[in-house]
């Protein structure tokens, strides 16, 4: 029976009871190698650096969530991005990248791939015209995050996809914040969806992992070859935990979105909060695009309070329920200082131009009762206000 509804897909996509035992959950196939019936005759797997039965089930599940062939899963989200680069780029090639993106992506491009002759241009991907102007005859890939980390800036995927088709360039969309449940880049014209499965997809702070999804079978085969060659496949146990997390993904995202909406609305009304960034707010500059492109707004928001860096640091040190930690998209509410944590490797000029100021706070709203999250933020904001009065914010260096 086809899985036509999102909740049903999340529970059953790519999965069936184990034929050997009847176990309703996919087993963890913790095996290095697989016995072959004869030379060149096997049951689909030969060595777990190349493929693994548990990983393959997760790949089928993720692909089905986006009406695509099985995805390719990796040990981390950054391993997925690295494999994408190795599959597509050569010395002399050029990449156009959204100016606001994860610090690890910036590090990969600026510090690693540049040494192999790959050039990257970081541009304001909110404007399809700016993206189009940045494409050169050497451009092989446009890579955007939407919503972007940590400012939630949006890229019009359909418009940029049209630009890329016109130029003969592939478009990859980092869809980590939204997952296939809230946004489907391939349906909007993208060639590749990029995921850190560590985040919402697994959703319980239990794993690290990554995935690439595409409807281009030749590209998927190339990505599997790269993964086998560099040894970056996801482990069976991590895949099993991720499969378990996906079963509640739509349910969790509905709650994450509702809680984030409540917290964002409260922050926006707070007299000490100077800026709130959340696509679900009518005041968000790209709210109309969010309504058109997304099927929900997710659990991530960002905000600033009076007092800049001093106040922001004091707030993060004062939270009690919320946890000061990197990562996002799990059941616990996490608070992060992007400028010093997730985006610490991004040059200050690029950060500030993109709106990632020293005082910006990123909040991954969890599944705790929003009243408790709000109460914790409220007391932390008061502590931060007192700290800012005692020690005025220093001028930016």
Language model features: what each stretch is:
Residues 20, 28-29, 37-57, 61-64, ...:
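Glycine-rich phosphate/pyrophosphate-binding loop
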Residues 43, 208, 242, 247, ...:
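Short amphipathic alpha-helical segments
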Residues 110, 119, 137-140, 317, ...:
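PLP-dependent enzyme catalytic core of the Aspartate aminotransferase-like
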Residues 275-361, 365:
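Conserved C-terminal alpha-helix-loop-beta "cap" of PLP-dependent enzymes
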Residues 33-82, 104-112:
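Conserved N-terminal alpha-helix of the aminotransferase class I/II PLP-enzyme fold
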Residues 65, 267-271, 319:
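Acidic-histidine catalytic/liganding microenvironments
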